[in-house]
Structures are given as C-alpha cells and as structure tokens.
Regions:
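P-loop/Walker-type NTP enzyme "switch/lid" segment
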Residues: 1-42, 150-152
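Hydrophobic residues at beta-strand termini and immediately following loops
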Residues: 11, 139-141
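C-terminal boundary of histidine-terminating zinc-finger modules
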Residues: 150-172
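Charged catalytic carboxylate motif
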Residues: 32, 85, 169
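Short, glycine-rich, amphipathic interfacial segments at transmembrane boundaries or analogous
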Residues: 143-149
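C-terminal alpha-helix
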Residues: 172-183
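Conserved catalytic-core segment of NTP-binding enzymes
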Residues: 41-139
Length: 183
C-alpha cells in the first residue's frame, strides 16, 4: 500500500498481476481478493478496485469483494455493447458469490459532447441503463491528453494537471457519485 500526496492510498498493479488469472484457478478463487482486503477494509471509507476491461477471474474477484460497481465506458459501440455482457457477469456473481453487489451507475469517459456518434451512443446507453437498472451519471469525463500523460507518469490527474478541464470533470463526477452514495 502506497500513500499519496492527495491523502489516499493505492496498490498499483504491476507485471506480476498478469499471471494472477492462472494463480486464481484454485477452489474458492472468487473470494481471494475479498479475503485479502478484509484486514484493512475498516481503515477506509472507500476501496476502489480498477479492473481490466475483461470479464475474467480478476473482475469476478473484484465484484465478489465489492458492494457497488461503477461502469466506466467510452462512447463507442463495442464498449457500450460490453455493458450487457458485464451485467450478465454481475448477475452471476450476485447469484453465486455476492448477492449484495449492485451496479451503481455508468460513467462515460473520453467523451466528446460535440461528436454525433457520442450523442448517439449515449442515447443507446440510456436505453441499456434502463434494462440493467443502473443510471448514467450526468457528469462525463471529456477526452483529454492530460489523462494519458498522467497515467504514463504514474500520477493521478489532480497532481499531474489539477487545473485542467478533465480534472474538473473528475471532481464533478466525484461530487455526483458521493451525493448518490450518501443520499
């Protein structure tokens, strides 16, 4: 666990995570992350687990450990189509591993509000959000080079480009998210 200037802690992924799918092939594999997080869970208000964009063992572990799921997605047809597959995985996790987990909402990232395709995909996603009973957040994260630069520099957007419009987008999203959590 690494402490940051921003007052939060992170456990960064590394190359060792690539082999985790094979390591997690034992009995009870879906509960490994939950067991690992349990000793420190009481020390945090929130634990955010950023999973790969696949629906493998790592993601199932995260869903088994979670109380809420946030779906970040780009405004692309394939990304949006993946939401229904993700919903099927969540339904399976609810049935077999974690009945209390729920999808809290869908967040659009790398969003360009001026592009026709972005608006069309958002309309499609709104229909999908009704199907999976999860709202689309009003806040969206605009496409910005600063996000990729921050990732390349292993920094968060607030430390890397705290006055950027994309940092403002993330602040607005955090505020919207927290209002929903504490409503």
């Amino acid at each position: 666990i690494q402490h940051t200037k921003g007052g939060y802690d992170v456990v960064p992924a590394n190359i060792m995570l690539a082999g985790a799918e094979q390591e997690l092939s034992q009995t009870g594999k879906e509960h490994r992350l939950k067991e690992a997080v349990a000793p420190v869970a009481g020390e945090y208000d929130f634990i955010v687990i950023d999973t790969p964009p696949s629906l493998g063992v790592l993601t199932v572990n995260a869903f088994t450990c979670a109380t809420d799921i946030l779906i970040p997605t780009t405004a692309g047809i394939f990304a949006t189509a993946g939401i229904s597959q993700l919903n099927e995985t969540v339904t399976s996790v609810q049935k077999y591993c974690n009945p209390g987990v729920k999808i809290r909402g869908i967040l659009f990232t790398k969003f360009n509000p001026r592009a026709n395709i972005s608006r069309q995909i958002k309309e499609l996603a709104e229909q999908l959000s009704e199907y999976i009973s999860a709202p689309i957040y009003k806040t969206y994260i605009r496409a910005a080079v600063a996000v990729e630069e921050a990732q390349a520099n292993r920094a968060d957007i607030f430390d890397y480009a705290g006055k950027s419009t994309v940092a403002d987008d993330y602040r607005a999203f955090i505020e919207e998210f927290l209002k929903g959590v504490y409503a």
